[in-house]
């Protein structure tokens, strides 16, 4: 089911982009009044703040962030959330970390299942306490081929999946997220 229309993902902030994507957002609102409109908006790295001119045309602000993976300092995430304080709901539209299935080590060893699970635990612990965060979507459900990913861990795959590429093996991060969703379900009952 489609629950939200998205008009973009991490597009550079130019006048042309704003004009085009604001028209897309207005068109989505006009054509389907039953669904909200979103986009993965930009973060101002200097201010560590969600800051995007497109936000005024959206119902929900999306952000992609990879604290603990591309951004090693996890302290950046609570600061980003504190600095932002938008007047609209936010969904974290991408987050995660690579893990080669069955590759083990410590939480500090990138590419291990332990590191990926730790990133998920820290994300959840941080995001669950921020009132304006209304959802999060991990990147991604299962590993997939990606010719640009040539490292020894990735081996031509994007390994951020919660499942292996054959969809048969559930990585530990899958269970971290499952536990969180079960807690949310119990709270709602």
What do the predicted segments below correspond to?
Residues 3-5, 18-30, 35-43, 53-189:
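Substrate-binding clefts and catalytic carboxylate motifs of secreted carbohydrate-active enzymes
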Residues 48-49:
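Switch/coupling sub-region of P-loop NTPases
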Residues 10-13, 67-69:
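Short histidine/acidic/glycine/proline-rich micro-motifs that form metal-
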């Amino acid at each position: 089911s489609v629950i939200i229309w998205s008009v973009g993902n991490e597009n550079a902030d130019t006048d042309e982009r704003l004009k085009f994507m604001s028209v897309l957002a207005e068109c989505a609102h006009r054509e389907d009044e039953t669904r909200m409109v979103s986009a993965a908006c930009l973060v101002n790295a200097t201010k560590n703040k969600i800051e995007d001119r497109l936000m005024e045309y959206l119902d929900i602000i999306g952000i992609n962030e990879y604290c603990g993976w591309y951004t090693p300092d996890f302290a950046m995430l609570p600061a980003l959330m504190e600095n932002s304080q938008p007047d609209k709901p936010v969904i974290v539209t991408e987050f995660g970390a690579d893990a080669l299935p069955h590759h083990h080590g410590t939480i500090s060893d990138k590419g291990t299942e332990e590191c990926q699970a730790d990133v998920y635990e820290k994300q959840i612990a941080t995001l669950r306490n921020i009132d304006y965060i209304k959802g999060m979507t991990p990147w991604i459900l299962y590993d997939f081929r990606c010719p640009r990913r040539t490292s020894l861990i990735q081996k031509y795959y994007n390994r951020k999946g919660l499942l292996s590429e054959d969809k048969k093996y559930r990585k530990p991060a899958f269970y971290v997220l499952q536990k969180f969703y079960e807690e949310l379900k119990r709270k709602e009952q």
